[in-house]
Amino acid sequence: MSNLPVISIARADGRRPLIFSWGVSSYFGWGVYGLNLMLHLADHPAVVPVCAVEFASGDVVLDPLRKRRMMAMARNSAPLWTALGQTEGDRAGLDHVLLQGLVNDLGAATSAHDRMLHGRPTVGVVFLEAATLSPRGLARAEHFALIVAGSRWNEQVLRNHGIDAVTTVLQGVDTALYHPAPRTGLFPGRFVVFSGGKLEFRKGQDLVLAAFRAFRQRHAEAL
């Protein structure tokens, strides 16, 4: 990173920037992850989340109070976006911890202005969709001080490929949205089971269907 332009963000409150390089949005999975990361770390005493990918008011659907907070956090991130636009070349260094979003085969997503970032250190964050990595993917893994896997299955895939600097961090459940509540009256007399997500091996729909088949044999009202 010695040959790269290095960006450093100074804060008057003494909190250290925690930069993450993926989007913030209410409309796709990574975006929801970034949105909740910012909201839940907004008042952290030691770090402040900074998004390396530009986002605006139209990208998020929130109640007015949380929307106001998110726009303040967008303003906190804007100096980084500006600094990235002023760097030369397609890579930039950061004098801060970087959480780098990774796609399949551990490819890194770019930041604002299509810059590839390098932090001190760089920690990869991944939600693999396949159980195999190419030789190029294995080489990419060596660039990260740690890789955070979004599921235990993801962690096991990485370990099966000889990658040991890996840990699992589950996203959890937003209990403000998902909680017991009075019945809505839809589907009267039925017990409804919802299973979301794309049709992918990693989401285990084959296991869900097998479990539901066994459940419905005992509970005919299940839907």
Residue ranges and their predicted role:
Residues S2-S8, I19, L62-V157:
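Extended catalytic core of nucleotide-activated donor transferases of GT-like folds
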Residues I19, L186-K203, L209-F212:
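Conserved donor-binding/catalytic core segment of Leloir-type glycosyltransferases
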Residues V48, L209-L223:
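A conserved nucleotide-sugar
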Residues P135-R136, V173-G189:
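Acidic anion/phosphate-binding donor-loop and adjacent secondary structure
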Residues A145-Q156, I163-P180:
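Donor nucleotide-sugar binding/catalytic pocket of nucleotide-sugar-dependent glycosyltransferases
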